[in-house]
């Protein structure tokens, strides 16, 4: 299941979404994420998936690759759905012994589940279509006004990029540790859910040690290349927003404003 996580991975393709400026994609992802939690009805949240589907088609990424990335969320989504089904008061739809499933619980559970799916898909699309270097440069340029008040903008952008880049690295490291422990008799696939969770506890120490080792190696590599933060740093390929970038930014911002103004009517 861990190998199915696509968050933090980058797939180099030539698509309209890949060619967009990273600032455009960051702004679109941020506004979409906020709007997703402003939408008040199940119908509006369901329709919010339409731009995600259009974006997936435009990226030219295999559909099964996107669906595979959502697979690790299913346990959390099912748990969230059950919590809303069993704890939300309202008109009873089905009664299962002492538990009553309400229509309101069905609506709330479906809304929250869809929000999680669309949010994960939007964030994954950002990292799948944007290289770590471009994402770092885009975040730094977006946050550059913060330099005037002394905020460490470059360092924040660099940390965010490294954190996203390390997600697939740590997943790969976890799989290696699990295979090594399985060869020594460890069992991660059988037993109840609680037993499976407990079996993952012995992974934490070697995984943390591996993460610290990789962080130390990265720090040494950056120092060997005379990295001293963003002061005086130039870019080989400066980011320049095209007409398409401005059009997408204006369109996304316009839809976001309309949602904020008329969310009660949706």
Curated annotation (Swiss-Prot):
Q: Which Pfam families would you find in this protein's record?
A: CbiQ
Keyword set, alphabetical order: Cell membrane, Membrane, Transmembrane, Transmembrane helix, Transport
Subcellular localization, as worded in the UniProt entry = Cell membrane
InterPro entries, per database record: ABC/ECF_trnsptr_transmembrane (IPR003339), ECF_transporter_component (IPR051611), EcfT (IPR024919)
Per the record, what is one GO cellular component?
plasma membrane
**Keyword field contains Repeat:** no
Domain of life, per lineage: Bacteria
Question: What membrane topology term does the record carry?
Answer: Multi-pass membrane protein
**What transmembrane ranges does the database entry give?**
26-46, 47-67, 69-89, 116-136, 151-171, 192-212, 246-266
Annotated GO molecular function terms are: transmembrane transporter activity
The entry sums up its family as follows: Belongs to the energy-coupling factor EcfT family.
Q: Which HAMAP family match?
A: EcfT
Q: What role does this protein play?
A: Transmembrane (T) component of an energy-coupling factor (ECF) ABC-transporter complex. Unlike classic ABC transporters this ECF transporter provides the energy necessary to transport a number of different substrates.
Provide the assembly information. Forms a stable energy-coupling factor (ECF) transporter complex composed of 2 membrane-embedded substrate-binding proteins (S component), 2 ATP-binding proteins (A component) and 2 transmembrane proteins (T component). May be able to interact with more than 1 S component at a time.
Q: Which PANTHER family match?
A: SLL0384 PROTEIN
Q: What is this protein called?
A: Energy-coupling factor transporter transmembrane protein EcfT
């Amino acid at each position: 299941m861990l190998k199915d996580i696509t968050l933090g991975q980058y797939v180099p393709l030539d698509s309209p979404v890949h060619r967009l400026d990273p600032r455009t994609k960051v702004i679109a992802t941020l506004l979409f994420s906020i709007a997703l939690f402003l939408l008040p009805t199940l119908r509006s949240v369901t329709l919010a998936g339409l731009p995600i589907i259009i974006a997936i088609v435009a990226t030219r990424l295999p559909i099964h690759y996107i669906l595979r990335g959502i697979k690790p969320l299913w346990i959390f989504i099912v748990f969230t759905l059950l919590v809303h089904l069993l704890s939300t008061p309202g008109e009873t739809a089905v009664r299962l012994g002492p538990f009553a499933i309400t229509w309101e619980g069905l609506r709330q559970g479906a809304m929250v589940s869809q929000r999680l799916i669309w949010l994960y898909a939007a964030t994954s699309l950002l990292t799948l279509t944007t290289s770590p270097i471009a994402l770092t440069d885009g975040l730094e340029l977006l946050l550059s006004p913060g330099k005037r008040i002394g905020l460490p903008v470059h360092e924040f952008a660099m940390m965010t990029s490294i954190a996203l880049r390390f997600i697939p690295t740590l997943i790969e490291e976890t799989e290696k540790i699990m295979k090594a422990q399985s060869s020594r008799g460890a069992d991660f696939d059988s037993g109840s859910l609680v037993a499976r969770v407990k079996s993952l506890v012995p992974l934490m120490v070697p995984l943390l040690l591996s993460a610290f080792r990789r962080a130390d190696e990265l720090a040494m590599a950056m120092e060997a290349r005379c990295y001293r933060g963003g002061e005086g740093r130039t870019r080989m390929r400066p980011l320049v927003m095209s007409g398409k970038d401005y059009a997408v930014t204006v369109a996304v911002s316009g839809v976001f404003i309309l949602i904020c103004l008329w969310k009660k009517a949706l």
